[in-house]
């Protein structure tokens, strides 16, 4: 028998190499590398996984197809120096065909053949497959390292793997009639990977040597959502009962029937996936924020909210969509029930925050995209001649309006344009360094940015500021004059301030370097040229009374 092991958190404790738990093997990694042992040699689990960053990032595919998710459950069985290929393959076949009743003639198995010629072909696994009752020997297919060789890292434990695929029928060929590869590991959706059996038998050294491990292990992984779609006979993971409750809520909110929903399914898939992901993230303590895991939580919530506007949902709705997620998964994952209040509250608050700035942020983005499309020239700042928006400009939109890169990219791609991701990440890293090692995107990130964006929008409506906001020129003149347009104290807009108050001021123009810009000795002063009843100063310089010092 196997020991049932609970899922670990989406936050992988003790593993600084991972942002999120992205596979079932993460909690057993120390066993494979030999730094830990377990009181069992056989295990089975259903692991919560997130794939939204790094090598394993499915975000771009979510919504565009029926099989990818940011959050999913990975089913797996494990052998730590116990059974090996013969039992693992036989039990896989038995479960799929005898227990679940999948048609034997529709199943294929892939095995490893080294395209580099350095590792022996896995004839052992191939021959075991051919011995399974009712298995078609012609359905054993060989592939190279990309498809059928697994490595935990650049060096260390590794080995061949054997994937099980199912032929869903000619009608599932989503590229039917076009010139494409229709087959296992091909380009269409007719053939679906169900299960992967990884056989960890080698240790890879930095000089390229492969040596047999003293103990051989088995690591299997099967996407829960995929196998449910096959067993329920539907053509989309999102049409299984796993998402029924969520889609029922969306249908009620929009007044759209299932048939109408399926005609333009992308927004519904994105919302269903992202709300489920956000609920599980918050349940594991990852709340919306500006850096790392918290940025991911914020991004997927805002992306879901933005897709909500595409189907007519302009008031906060995500908490309502999350209710069935908590209800349906809560019995197996009690952390969802325990964190119910936090989940619903964070979803609603994040939606409200984003609603304050999305209009301004998307308007500024659209202005840049219009220029990009109309000119396709590098003569304009922030655009190039390849239809790609400069990543630093995209970062400015996030820093000012809280518009995540992923949403900017969505909007650009809807117009056959794109955004430079490398440039965005570089700008983000530069800003983190400038603001002292990544302090939540600096003073002008996140909620602070959104608050000031709201003031900016109001001043623009009143014609007190132009389209581009505060005029910024720290180079031309050491002296800049302007009237006080707005005052901020303790994070609130105020009409007046008294002597001794620490306040911030919004000016029509400034000669100060932006926060975290310039050098240590780049300082200056704000002075009142004439007496006025409520002296204050602020953004660009914080201080007390009528005179204060501003710095970079």
What do these predicted ranges mean?
Residues 538-545, 549:
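Glycine-biased, low-complexity coil/linker segments
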């Amino acid at each position: 028998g196997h020991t049932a092991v609970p899922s670990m958190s989406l936050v992988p404790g003790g593993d600084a190499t991972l942002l999120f738990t992205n596979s079932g093997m993460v909690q057993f990694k120390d066993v494979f590398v030999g730094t830990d042992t377990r009181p069992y040699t056989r295990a089975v689990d259903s692991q919560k996984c997130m794939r939204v960053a790094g090598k394993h990032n499915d975000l771009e595919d979510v919504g565009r197809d029926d099989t990818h998710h940011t959050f999913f459950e990975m089913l797996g069985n494990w052998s730590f120096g116990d059974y090996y290929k013969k039992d693992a393959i036989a039990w896989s076949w038995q479960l799929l065909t005898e227990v679940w009743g999948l048609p034997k003639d529709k199943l294929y198995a892939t095995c490893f053949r080294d395209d580099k010629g350095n590792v022996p072909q896995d004839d052992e696994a191939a021959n075991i497959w051919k011995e399974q009752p009712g298995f078609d020997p012609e359905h054993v297919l060989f592939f190279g390292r990309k498809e059928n060789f697994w490595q935990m890292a650049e060096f260390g434990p590794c080995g061949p793997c054997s994937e099980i695929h199912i032929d869903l029928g000619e009608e599932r060929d989503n590229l039917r009639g076009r010139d494409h590869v229709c087959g296992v590991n091909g380009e269409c959706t007719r053939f679906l990977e169900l299960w992967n059996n990884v056989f960890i038998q080698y240790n890879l050294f930095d000089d390229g040597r492969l040596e047999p491990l003293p103990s051989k292990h088995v690591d299997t992984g099967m996407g829960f959502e995929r196998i449910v779609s096959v067993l329920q006979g539907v053509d989309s993971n999102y049409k299984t009962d796993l998402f029924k409750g969520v889609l029922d809520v969306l249908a009620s909110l929009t007044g759209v029937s299932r048939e109408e929903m399926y005609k333009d399914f992308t927004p519904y898939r994105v919302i269903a996936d992202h709300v489920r992901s956000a609920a599980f993230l918050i349940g594991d303590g990852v709340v919306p924020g500006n850096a790392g895991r918290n940025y991911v939580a914020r991004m997927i919530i805002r992306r879901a909210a933005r897709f909500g506007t595409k189907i007519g949902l302009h008031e906060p709705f995500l908490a309502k969509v999350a209710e069935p997620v908590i209800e349906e998964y809560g019995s197996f994952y009690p952390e969802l029930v325990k964190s119910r209040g936090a989940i619903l509250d964070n979803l609603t608050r994040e939606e409200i925050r984003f609603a304050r700035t999305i209009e301004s942020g998307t308007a500024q983005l659209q202005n840049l995209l219009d220029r990009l499309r109309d000119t396709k020239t590098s003569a304009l700042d922030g655009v190039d001649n390849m239809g790609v928006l400069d990543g630093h400009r995209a970062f400015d939109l996030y820093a000012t309006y809280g518009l995540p890169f992923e949403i900017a990219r969505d909007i650009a791609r809807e117009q056959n344009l794109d955004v430079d991701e490398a440039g965005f990440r570089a700008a983000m890293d530069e800003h983190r360094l400038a603001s002292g090692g990544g302090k939540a995107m600096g003073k002008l990130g996140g909620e602070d940015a959104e608050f000031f964006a709201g003031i900016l929008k109001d001043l623009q409506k009143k014609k007190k500021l132009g389209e581009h906001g505060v005029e910024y020129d720290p180079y031309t003149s050491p002296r800049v004059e302007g009237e006080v347009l707005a005052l901020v104290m303790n994070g609130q807009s105020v009409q007046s301030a008294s002597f001794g108050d620490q306040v911030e001021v919004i000016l029509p123009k400034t000669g100060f370097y932006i926060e975290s810009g310039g050098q240590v000795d780049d300082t200056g002063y704000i002075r009142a040229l004439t007496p006025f009843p409520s002296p204050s100063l602020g953004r660009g310089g914080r201080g007390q009374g009528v005179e204060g010092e501003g710095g970079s």
